[in-house]
């Protein structure tokens, strides 16, 4: 039986030295982040392998650590017994059923979406997925998805349509947490807010508090 991830504060790593990224991950998890996706493009496979290993050793016993796109890296690190819990894949990556077959039933697998059509397509594979990411919430400099921003109201429709928990992504900040939580999303993915914060622990706590307020 695979674990149910806590997606409320979902940290996605950004650009920076490996030391800085690991430090931010550790501090974000101290503030309550319970899912960490290692994604620092552009990066070589070996660099991503080393970074994921470092993040997993730092926080993998407390938070679920996912690898962006690279199923092979997740497989290799899991084979070594490291606390790497799964992957997040995009629309152009391996088919999710093949990812599940490779990683096994206990791995966490997320998929990028952001339109009605993509959510409906994800619903067809709901039994092999754990959640979907949907965005962008607003335009973001960290990733150009080619999809129009959803805004707050765009999430209500996707949450209602989805058979899976939905994570909002795309320049989400802690200030957005109450309004986005009110739409029914399961969590908020944050890159810059945590990477650039002088206090990632406090930032994560503020986001989780705001998320709880939006759910009341």
Swiss-Prot record:
Gene Ontology BP annotations: thiamine biosynthetic process; thiamine diphosphate biosynthetic process
Keyword list, A-Z: Magnesium, Metal-binding, Thiamine biosynthesis, Transferase
GO cellular component, one term: cytoplasm
Cofactor note: Binds 1 Mg(2+) ion per subunit.
Positions bound to Mg(2+): 69, 93
Miscellaneous comment in the UniProt entry for this protein: There is also a thiED fusion protein in this bacteria (AC Q8FTH8).
Protein purpose: Condenses 4-methyl-5-(beta-hydroxyethyl)thiazole monophosphate (THZ-P) and 2-methyl-4-amino-5-hydroxymethyl pyrimidine pyrophosphate (HMP-PP) to form thiamine monophosphate (TMP).
Protein name: Thiamine-phosphate synthase
Species name: Corynebacterium efficiens (strain DSM 44549 / YS-314 / AJ 12310 / JCM 11189 / NBRC 100395)
